[in-house]
Each structure stands twice: as structure tokens, then as C-alpha cells.
């Protein structure tokens, strides 16, 4: 989607207006590319906002496999002049046609098999893709031996779980929905994670805002503890972690190195204003400081 940001140019007044390609898929792909992967971005594009968005996407080190849609691409405007991100406007999203959905589905499956991993992310808010698309994507990609990592909210996540993803990234408040109560103890968190595993997840990473992420795979569990920073923004940190996971899985790295790198990618994003951004050199330095604490 097209992101329009208003920032203060100087303390004396005046505004600075930025146009960026945005959306979870864009931020994940950007971080994966920074870490040396060759991501392929699949999605819809169209309308006036799409005409502005395409050249911004083409500036990224990402292969584009975009499906033209009769409806416009999503766009939103937010104001950062106060130092906080304040939403001003967001365009409505119209449902794509059956033909457009079919084209995106087949394009995504082919790209995943070519790339070696599928990172399945949330759509533009309000985008009405049929729920079964998510489970079908996971199942078809997995059937060909390609790993899948997902970062989705319910009910899309429930559909994806039916396909058996290798790894699910979820935050603690969304995880709480699986046991209808807060995941405020390790016991309750493990109970909620078990629901995801029983539904099809191979492993689960739970992000917990300022608390260390928790990782569960099989009978093993860890806290994932990156360096702690006091001032920064958590916006985009989860997407940077997702990009790190996808890049490391595509490269076939060992599990612990994958976890350390993805946690470092999220920590690096915390220090920056740009979503899904970070320096590979900084991430590699921070990864050496990440602790994996067995639970």
C-alpha cells in the first residue's frame, strides 16, 4: 500500500512529506533483502495509488510479481509531527475479483517454490480475500517441501493452521484469544501455544512487547532476549523479525542462528523510524548479544 507521512521539517515550522511503499509484506521483504535474501513480493496493485506505488516498489531490492486489479491499491496518511504516529486517513479496500484472486494464488505458490520459503503476512486492512486462501496456500506450498512461516491474525490464522505451517509468529494478546483469557503466566502461555500446535503449527514464536519473546518447538521452549533499548519505536519490529525469520529459513541456517538473527532484526528496527528497516552490519552485531534462555 501507499504510505504518506507528514513530519516536521524544522523546529521553526514547515512540513516534510514522504511517500513510501508500505504494508506488512513490503516491510518483511525489505528486511529479508537487507539480510541477503532474494525476496519475491506478491500482491495486488492498481488504481491511482498503484500508479504512484509501483515505482516506489521498483526501487527496492525485491522481485515484484504483482497482480493488476481493477480496484485501487490501499493508501494511508499519517502525521508524525508530534513525534507519534497519528493516523489521518485510510482508503477503503474493495474485494478483488475471482480471476484476480486465482492469479495471485498461483503466482504466490510458484514464487514460494522458487524462493525456498513462503512468508505469509496479513493483507491490507479490509481486503476481503476468501479465508480458505490462506490454508490452501500453506498446504500447497508445504506439499512441495517448501517451509512456511506465517504472521496472521484470526480468522486468517485459523485457516493457515489447517495447512500446517512450520512456524507461526504471534503476539501475546492475539495468542490470548486461544484460551479466552490473558497469557500472564508461563503455564497459560504454554496452554495457548499448545492450541496452535494442535491446530497445525510446527513451532511458535510469541512476541510480548517489551518482554522477551517466547519460542516453543516440540518439547523445547526458550526466552529470546535481545539487547534492551529504552528509546525507540516498536512499530515494524515484528515485521523485521518476520523478515529475519524468512531470510534465515531460506538460507537453511540452524535454528538457534535463525532465532538470534530475527530477534536482532527486530531490535535494530526499534532504533529506527523506518518500518521494516535496519542495517545488516548492525543486525549481525546485535545477534551476537541475543540470549536464548531455556525454559
Describe each PLM feature range:
Residues 13-74, 286-289:
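Substrate-binding N-lobe of the ribokinase-like
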Residues 30, 75-79, 212-216:
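Short beta-strand scaffold segments in enzyme catalytic cores
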